Amino acid sequence: NYLLELNKLFDLGFSAVQGVRDAKNLDTLYAALDGARDIYYHFYDGKLLYHVGSSATLAGSGMAFTTQLYKECLGHLDITGAGFDKILQKEIVSRGYRIAFANEAIVFDEKTSKSDQLVNQRARWINTWFKYFSFGFGLIGKGIFQFNWNKFLFGLILLRPPLFIFLLIGLFCMLLNLILNPFLALIWFLGFVIFIIGFILALAINNTDARIYKSLWGIPTFIFYQVLSLLKVRNANKHSVATKHFHADKKTQ
C-alpha cells in the first residue's frame, strides 16, 4: 500500500513525495512523545503546508524521489554528517519543484525508548537546524523576486526553530512582558493557548493512539532532555543517532 500511495502522486507528475512516518512502538514515555511530535509535524509541515500550495518538509524517512531528480539535486555535492534531507529539500524547492504529501503512504518508524538516546538524537537534529536554517533566507528571496509562493512559504518554514526552542522563546517573552508590558504578555499567553489548541487538533484529526494522549503529561520532561541536547549540539555529529531496539531486553527481564 505504501508504494501504491506514493505512485498515485508520481502519476500526477510530482517528482518528490513525503509519506507519513508512524510510530512502531509506543511502549515508553519518550517513544509516545516522539510519536506525538511526528504527528504534529506531519500535519502542519506536511499535509497543511502541501495543501496551501507549498511543499511538505522532508522527514528523513518515508520519502521518495525520481532517480533523475535525486541525482540532479545531490549528485554534485559531497555531503557528510546528518542533514542530507535538509539539503535535498532546499535543492528540490529552489529548482521549482513541489514536494507532495501522501497522507496514506505510511512507513513504521522505531521510536526512541531511552533518555540518553533521545538526547543524542535531538542534539544531532538540532545541529542540522543551526547548520542549514539559513537556506530559508535564500528561498524567501527567490520567492519574492520570482513571485513564487512555494519557495516563499517553504523558506519561512525553514527559518522556524525546533519546536521546543520556539516554545521556550515564547515563554521567555511572555514572562518578560509581565514586567514590561502586561498587555503584550496577554497576547503571548493567547498565542500559547492557540498553539495548544492547534496541537490537540493535529492529534485529534489523526485518530491518535490513546497512549500518546496519556504521555502528554511528560512534555516538560521531554523539553528538559531537548534542552540537554542543545548543550551537546557542537559535538553532535560524533554521536550515533540510530535508534536502538530494547524489546529483546524486556523479554529477558
Region locations from a protein language model:
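Catalytic core of nucleotide-sugar-dependent glycosyltransferases
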Residues: 39-44, 119-140, 222-235
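Nucleotide-sugar-dependent glycosyltransferase catalytic core
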Residues: 80, 110-127, 211-214
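Acidic donor-diphosphate engagement hotspot in glycosyltransferases and nucleotidyltransferases
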Residues: 1-3
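Catalytic beta-strand/loop signature of glycosyltransferases that borders the donor
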Residues: 20, 99-106
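Active-site-adjacent helix/loop segment of glycosyltransferases
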Residues: 119-173
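Membrane-embedded multi-pass helical conduit in multi-pass membrane proteins
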Residues: 157-237
